[in-house]
């Protein structure tokens, strides 16, 4: 059995203790995987149903810092030697897919294959609105982005004129 832990990339701990030192301690404690979470924008007010709470209402402090997931993964990878590094669920439709494919492939190559990735369509409509992405298209974007990521990672990113992304 493999056991993983979340490396905090939100709240006061990352700035106080450092993501790298926390990751190193977790790896030394025997964890096999180290995962962070992902949000780009946390709105002060959200009406979206929060799927991780008992009452469906958001419970975060809008002033709480959320550090970028790719940066957190990179710091975690740099501070460890053995543990798998990843994002529990990255909101892929909010990312530029070719840039993100390169970032993840770079982390994977530079860690000797320790990168893992969980992706999802996202649940926070206000985050999509803040970033100018149509929330209603998140599922279609996820499908399109995943196909493009796979093509980039296998070395054959064919030109495409997708519904949401064009690759010349």
Regions found by a protein language model. Give the residues of each.
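N-terminal beta1-alpha1-beta2 module of alpha/beta enzyme domains
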Residues: 1-79
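Internal, glycine-rich beta/alpha segment that forms the wall or movable "lid"
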Residues: 44-45, 55-59, 74, 83, ...
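Short beta-strands and strand-loop turn motifs
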Residues: 4-6, 85-88
